[in-house]
UniProtKB/Swiss-Prot annotation:
Lineage: Bacteria, Pseudomonadati, Pseudomonadota, Gammaproteobacteria, Alteromonadales
Major location category of this protein: cytoplasm
Name of the protein this chain belongs to: 2-isopropylmalate synthase
One GO biological process term: L-leucine biosynthetic process
Native species: Shewanella loihica (strain ATCC BAA-1088 / PV-4)
Enzyme nomenclature, EC number: 2.3.3.13
Length: 523
């Protein structure tokens, strides 16, 4: 048996299900490209039949990614498999992942069928998917609670039908490691054709055991782990990719396993996913948390100073976290910025040097010193900028009365190239700015969440504002970055306004196309 563990990333499918606002196609592509650099073997990027937006994003990613296998999810239904195959057809290499529930509670309560009927559906789905590709994965949903006799029958039948990968999910995060390891061992002991497929696991974290269960599974013969960056996902989340990768790398002598993950890309990928998904990483999160390499105890600090491996089982550098936060000023040239970006793992294709350097100089003039984390924040915001913006912030002036708690804001917006100025009073500067923007634009945006975070250290740190807003029953995520909190807040709102404007344009175009088809059909 091979000692290579296949890393199947499902950040863009299972992970995205946990988000308050769906990612845009552009944001999904950014994450997919980062996952490709990270070295994931397979990336599951959507559920094409679920919506036109998901279909488009899967197709866009499939057309772009070259070094990882792109996968799409489909229920055990022909229409789902058709949509997956169509969206993936532009990929250099792709996989169709089809699934059906196998536990007694799911079969009887959800599917309302007999187990034999469900088995026939599974076999039919695998055979149908094989018409489009040899790389078909089949999942036994809720395998952790499926009677072992039924699970063995299902796995054997799916392999016989042509599935090359069989996934055993602990869908509700119910099992403990000894139990889950026993399930995997039973499959290897009892399924006669088990050697004809790769056994995969997909563990959820409802009891905090997803990583432990996944590691136990590979110790019993599984050779694919399904996971997400930062462990994001439904309910309590999924198995964490970075934890799996570093466990296998750090304990290689004990486990005798390896992955194809480029660990130096972990830190950057984690940051990107956290920012785009608007899901901050908890400080004490293993591997990628802010405190993961921080030592507060005097005894620990003394030990690390004497020998780093006294209290560090891996180095920050091993995950791409550079200890050298070299400060840069407005006198730093382009070559310095380019060098720092290269050291942080960014290629020239990841940013526009002219745009970045212009933003860098503006920031350096404001705060004097610019650090690595500032550059990363600037690159992130640059990447969110769209080619076509209907709204732009030209000027923002705020006056606050601390005794009354009131503030007045005057804003000048660029709306389709024309300047519009309005003023408003509110309960604090941000509220006043938002009311003035609404008055100038005529947009009524319902903000459901507002989050402020510091990007860096000290009083001159950049402030990043993330907002989630409701518009026509859809959620949109806006981000703003500035040394001034009110300015960052205004930028985040205008980002959302541009997103909603584009959504309206897309809906308008779809309506026109539908009308045109109707008229043609009537001729």
């Amino acid at each position: 048996m091979s000692n290579r563990v296949i890393i199947f990333d499902t950040t863009l499918r299972d992970g995205e299900q946990a988000l308050a606002a769906s990612l845009t196609v552009k944001e999904k592509l950014q994450i997919a490209l980062s996952l490709e650099r990270l070295g994931v073997d397979v990336m599951e990027v959507g559920f094409p039949v679920s919506s036109p937006g998901d279909f488009e994003s899967v197709q866009t990613i499939a057309r772009t990614i070259k070094n990882s296998r792109v996968c799409a999810l489909a229920r055990a239904l022909e229409k789902d498999i058709d949509a997956a195959a169509q969206s993936l057809s532009v990929a250099e290499q792709f996989r169709i992942h089809t699934f059906i529930s196998t536990s007694t509670i799911h079969v009887e309560s959800k599917l309302k069928r007999s187990f034999d009927q469900v088995l026939d559906m599974a076999v039919g789905a695998v055979k149908y998917a094989r018409r489009f590709t040899d790389d078909v994965e089949f999942s036994c949903e809720d395998a952790g609670r499926t009677p072992i006799d039924n699970l063995c029958r299902m796995v054997e039948a799916a392999i016989k039908a042509g599935a090359k990968t069989i996934n055993i999910p602990d869908t509700v995060g119910y099992t403990v490691p000894s139990e889950f390891g026993g399930i995997i061992q039973n499959l290897f002991d009892r399924v006669p054709n088990i050697d004809q497929a790769v056994i995969s696991v997909h563990c959820h974290d409802d009891l905090g055991l997803s990583v432990a269960n996944s590691i136990t599974a590979v110790q019993h013969g599984a050779r694919q782990i399904e996971c997400t960056v930062n462990g994001i996902g439904e309910r309590a989340g999924n198995c964490s990719l970075e934890e799996i990768a570093m466990i296998i790398a750090t304990r290689k002598a004990s486990l005798g396993l390896e992955t194809g993950i480029n660990a130096k890309e972990i830190h950057r990928t984690s940051n990107l996913v956290s920012q785009l998904c608007n899901m901050p990483v908890q400080a004490n999160k293993a591997i990628v948390g802010a405190n993961a390499f921080t030592h507060s105890s005097g005894i620990h600090q003394d030990g690390v100073l004497k020998s780093q491996n006294t209290y560090e089982i891996m180095t920050p550098e091993s995950i791409g976290l550079n200890r050298n936060n070299l400060n840069m000023t407005s006198r730093s040239g382009r070559h310095v910025i380019k060098h720092r970006m290269e050291e942080m793992g960014y290629g020239e294709q990841d940013y526009d040097m002219d745009t970045l350097y212009e933003a860098f100089l503006k920031l350096a003039d404001k705060k004097g010193q610019v650090f690595d984390y500032d550059l990363e924040a600037l690159v992130y915001v640059e990447a969110q900028a769209e080619d076509e913006n209907h709204y732009g912030l030209q000027q923002l002036v705020v006056h606050s009365d601390s005794t009354q708690g009131q503030a007045t804001a005057t804003v000048t917006l660029s709306i389709d190239g024309k300047a519009v100025t309005e003023a408003a009073t509110g309960n604090g500067p941000v509220d006043a700015a938002y009311k003035a923007i609404a008055r100038a634009s005529g947009c009524e945006i319902n903000i459901s969440s507002y989050q402020l975070s510091a990007k860096g250290q000290g009083q001159d740190a950049l402030g990043q504002v993330d907002i989630t807003a409701k518009y026509h029953d859809q959620s949109f995520h806006g981000v703003g970055l500035a040394t001034d909190v009110v300015e960052a807040s205004a930028a985040a709102l205008i980002h959302v306004m541009n997103l909603t404007w584009r959504a309206d344009k897309v809906a308008e175009n779809k309506h026109k196309l539908k009308q045109a088809r109707t008229e043609l059909g009537g001729v």
